[in-house]
């Protein structure tokens, strides 16, 4: 936490939502004077840790033990064991993602998630302490629906639209992670909307608040728990603070942005808006959307100039016929189509680099 007597931006954000760490390095997580809730990851973070010297011995041993079972068995066990290094340093869950290369294959997604479940059990990590990230495509979300029924907790990732969020609700998922910025914006700053008041001005804020308001309504109408909104893909501390004001339940934040948040002294008078303290129950005791953000409910800058003003309907069965309706919606929305493809391409790159590392290791053991 911040130094005594001075509240940091990180301290303030933790009052409004659960702060998670989107990074896997155990030394960094331990060194922070803050116990994060969840530790999230993706194929890039797993690949970085797989190549780290601190895991070399474990990697060799695991490759020897599982030789003959294929690269994925080794990769999956290593990913779980590397998460295990952080389990005592966090309050909540560790998260790992199914193969992005199989995002349109229900059975392969199901198989990989079940393999994670088996490896977590072997490592002594219960289902209350992990969650499996599933790409928000029709086939993968159909796998998530089955996993939810089996009691395996899931998160809908690579999520860019209200339609995807509704599909995740229909799959009974624990969390969703709307990407606040598209993945390419982290490296191509020309794609990043550099605004002074992200909650109000960032082009993705309307979609985030529309998801939150839709989930609040569904909870009220059905009494059924809705996925918790774990906002992700922040480039600046200001964007992370916007997640608090919008009413997100958690924010998973990179180590670089977390360091900045921890060093900034909080001054409410210099903030464009402020979130409320987190409620006891995310939906039962949900706070209303701040008045200044209500205009976001009726706009969608990402939809382009020809948007008809209609939000995705909760009456559509997005998972029927292998997820045909959600795939159709993903294809029809230009922002989702592009950003989903970019995210999967990025993570497939990480997957392929890890596969090469495993195969190189197998050649030596």
Label the predicted regions.
Residues 1-33:
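N-terminal amphipathic alpha-helix/helix-capping segment at the start of soluble metabolic enzymes
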Residues 9-20, 125-131, 143-156, 217-231:
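Short beta-strand/loop segments at the ligand-binding rim of alpha/beta enzyme cores
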Residues 17-23, 37-41, 92-98, 130-134, ...:
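Hydrophobic faces of well-ordered beta-strands that scaffold small-molecule active sites
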Residues 36, 41-140:
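Active-site beta->alpha loop and helix N-cap motifs at the rims of alpha/beta catalytic domains
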Residues 76-87, 110-117, 141-144, 165, ...:
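Generic structural signal for well-ordered alpha-helices
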Residues 94, 98-180, 191-201, 206-209:
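Helix-rich catalytic cores of soluble enzyme domains
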Residues 155, 160-302:
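Catalytic alpha/beta core domains of metabolic enzymes, predominantly
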Residues 296-365:
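C-terminal extensions of enzymes
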